Swiss-Prot record:
Keywords: DNA-binding, Isopeptide bond, Metal-binding, Nucleus, Repeat, Transcription, Transcription regulation, Ubl conjugation, Zinc, Zinc-finger
Lineage of the organism: Eukaryota, Metazoa, Chordata, Craniata, Vertebrata
Gene: Znf710
Cellular compartments per GO CC: nucleus
GO molecular function: DNA binding; zinc ion binding
Localization: Nucleus
Free-text function comment from the UniProt entry: May be involved in transcriptional regulation.
SUPFAM superfamilies xref list: beta-beta-alpha zinc fingers
Organism: Mus musculus (Mouse)
Protein name stated in the entry: Zinc finger protein 710
């Protein structure tokens, strides 16, 4: 229906028509071929008001008879119906061969060369055809007497409606055309239509250029407006659909791409944060030979090697102090998120890895493996200062630093120095306020979970650590280590008052209390006084019928471990404690002390005992005051019981339980 017409350079609004089109419309008078003028007699004033702008078909291609009629200036007569059909069919065929069909003339603005074409206006001629749906004819707009000037709408849009000069639609028979599909009122979809899907031929753009599409028909769908405005087309006004300023952009796809790009960036940032390899450049020069044709990634700062590159990157970040992952509970920093997740198990109380020997639980398998070395004698790394063995080189290196620095564990609160980190942590707990972990059996509280776990072993009567020399059992490994020193015969700690020597410093400090006159702890039954609270608790067992220490050989029970150890010498037939002044021998050190005081008048001297186990068995009789009866430690004072003693003799009475509870809270 529409086609291009090149108006050229002009100053007035002029419509240029070919001679064939003018002849068909009856606008040519008897003039020469190139000097044709518009003849007013050729108009059809009686038919003009009845014609609509869309009822008349488009002009057909010029034929020889039409040229002859136009040149002679003769009035055109009504052609026969067969000729009309032939002309219209030829016109349809001609229209498909056109490369530049005429369209309505609208001022065009080329965005790329807008400044160069400001002064030159290009117009399009639009001849409405039968592209609209057939329906009742509408009355056309009234044509003014001034001719073509009245048809010019404005200075911006200069066009002439040639439908007023068309023939009656009643005399023409249109060829069958594919009905135009209804516009989809669904949400705006920007992609170009598929001609096979939409049911109309491919459209052509207004001006030739890089964006011009091949065309077979002059029909232009409303949603193929130039792409310049993201607003969807207005379905109520067809005149606004062809305006160049009402195009659209790929809004939905761009938003989808933006969302996808945003999520990709977030995932990339998170991956960088998790991998922690954004600023560490590791090349193949870090690979070293590890034997068996294997290579490991080695750190150049500490020569530590790893099997994977990622572990080396994480290790190097540790040298730089980069720990981006923080614990929300205690604010402790970690290099990897996996380390943080493992640390969070300690706050949750989850320890899935359990030792089968001592039943101690750990959060990591590596900690359990390191702990299992405590149950073995494998210590390949030894300190060259003190000879102490270690299972790992890192432990040895940390231990040797203590020898070199001297002050490595200092409290930031009070400035006290400690030999080990464990002691410093326990001391720092005293500055933190109330305790956190409490025993459900005896209501005793502790600063650390490990202390509570070690304490619970006493209630469970679990003693997994056994001395290989004497068979004595201990609940904790450090107790066994301290006990093993007694078999070596080395006593490094000596009392400055009486000269007595001890293998452990704790035993010497406890012994030093007997030289003071202060005895703050008193028994409310016999009114005896004691230097230590632990000594008073041990004494209270004398007033109770409970005898928790039982001999495995004969089944005899004792109320003190010290007495049980002395009893065990009877089965061995040994009396390790010998008097230096006579030939008397005793199986208990307390009996020897009483013998020397009564027979020889010697109060307290350092005795070389052949039984070093006594120092770990609790306070001995020499540490008690002079008013204490020594019968408590004599073998004759024991109440011997058979193996199958009655339940009344092995259980506490209600009164005794109250007394024990009273002294436990001291």
């Amino acid at each position: 229906m529409e086609g291009f017409m090149d108006s050229g350079t002009q100053t007035d609004a002029v419509v240029v028509l070919s001679l064939a089109q003018a002849a068909v419309l009856g606008l040519v008078s008897e003039n020469e071929l190139f000097g044709a003028t518009i003849s007013a007699e050729a108009f059809y004033p009686d038919l003009g008001p009845e014609l609509t702008g869309t009822a008349m078909g488009e002009p057909g291609p010029p034929g020889p008879d039409i040229y002859q009629l136009a040149c002679n200036g003769r009035a055109l007569e009504e052609p026969p119906e067969e000729e009309v059909l032939e002309v219209e069919a030829a016109f349809e065929k001609h229209t498909r061969r056109k490369t530049r069909p005429p369209v309505r003339l609208v001022p065009k603005v080329k965005f790329e060369k807008a400044e160069e074409e400001e002064e030159q206006e290009v117009y399009e001629v639009s001849v409405p055809g039968d592209d609209k749906d057939p329906g009742p004819a509408e009355a056309p707009a009234e044509v003014a007497s001034s001719g073509c000037e009245a048809l010019v709408q404005s200075s911006a849009v200069k066009m002439i409606d040639l439908s007023a000069f068309s023939r009656k639609p009643r005399t023409l028979r249109h060829l069958p055309r594919t009905p135009r599909p209804e516009l989809d009122m669904a949400p705006f979809d920007p992609p170009f239509p598929d001609p096979a899907r939409d049911g109309f031929p491919e459209p052509s753009m207004a001006l030739p250029g890089p964006e011009t599409l091949p065309t077979e028909c002059s029909f232009e769908p409303p949603h193929l407006a130039p792409l310049s405005n993201p607003e969807p087309p207005n379905m109520t006004s067809t005149t606004e659909l062809v305006k160049p300023e009402q195009g659209f952009v790929w809004q939905e796809s761009s938003e989808f791409e933006a969302d996808t790009a945003g999520s990709t960036v977030e995932r990339h940032k998170k991956a960088q944060l998790d991998r922690l390899d954004i600023n560490v450049q590791i090349d193949d020069s870090y690979l070293v030979e590890a034997g068996d044709r294997q290579k490991r990634w080695q750190c150049r700062m500490c020569e530590k090697s790893y099997t994977s590159k990622y572990n080396l990157v994480t290790h190097i970040l540790g040298h730089n102090g980069i720990k981006p992952h923080s614990c929300p509970h205690c604010s402790k920093l970690f290099k990897q998120p996996s380390h943080l997740q493992t640390h969070l198990l300690t706050h949750q109380g989850t320890r899935p890895h359990k030792c089968q020997v001592c039943h101690k639980a750990f959060t990591q398998t590596s900690h359990l493996k390191r702990h299992m070395l405590l149950h073995s004698e494998v210590k390949p790394y030894s300190c060259h200062f003190c000879g102490r063995g270690f299972a790992y080189p890192s432990e040895l290196k940390a231990h040797e630093v203590k020898h070199e620095s001297g002050r490595c564990h200092v409290c930031v609160e009070c400035g006290l120095d400690f030999s080990t980190l464990t002691q410093l942590k326990r001391h720092l707990a005293s500055h933190q306020g109330p305790t956190l972990y409490q025993c459900l059996e005896c209501d005793k509280s502790f600063h650390y979970r490990s202390q509570l776990q070690n304490h619970m072993l006493k209630h469970q009567n679990v003693r997994p650590f056994v001395c290989t020399e004497c068979g004595m059992e201990f609940s904790q490994i450090h107790h066994l280590k301290q006990h093993s020193l007694t078999h070596k015969g080395v006593k490094e700690f000596k009392c400055e008052v009486c000269g007595r020597e001890f293998t452990l410093q704790a035993n010497m400090k406890r012994h030093m209390l007997i030289h003071t006159s202060v005895r703050p702890y008193q028994c409310h039954i016999c009114f005896k006084t004691f230097v230590q609270k632990q000594t008073l608790k041990t004494h209270m067992i004398v007033h109770s019928p409970v005898k928790p220490f039982k001999c495995k050989v004969c089944g005899k029970s004792f109320n003190r471990m010290y007495n049980l150890l002395g009893h065990m010498h009877l089965h061995a037939g040994s009396k390790p404690f010998k008097c230096p002044y006579c030939s008397s021998k005793f199986n208990l050190k307390g009996n020897l002390s009483r013998h020397m005081k009564v027979k020889h008048g010697v109060m307290d001297i350092s005795l070389d005992s052949q039984d070093p186990m006594m120092e770990l068995a609790g306070p001995d009789p020499s540490e008690l005051d002079n008013h204490q009866e020594m019968e408590d430690f004599e073998e004759n004072a024991y109440t011997y019981s058979s193996v199958d003693s009655s339940a009344e003799a092995s259980t506490l009475t209600e009164q005794a339980m109250k007394e024990m509870a009273y002294y436990n809270v001291l």
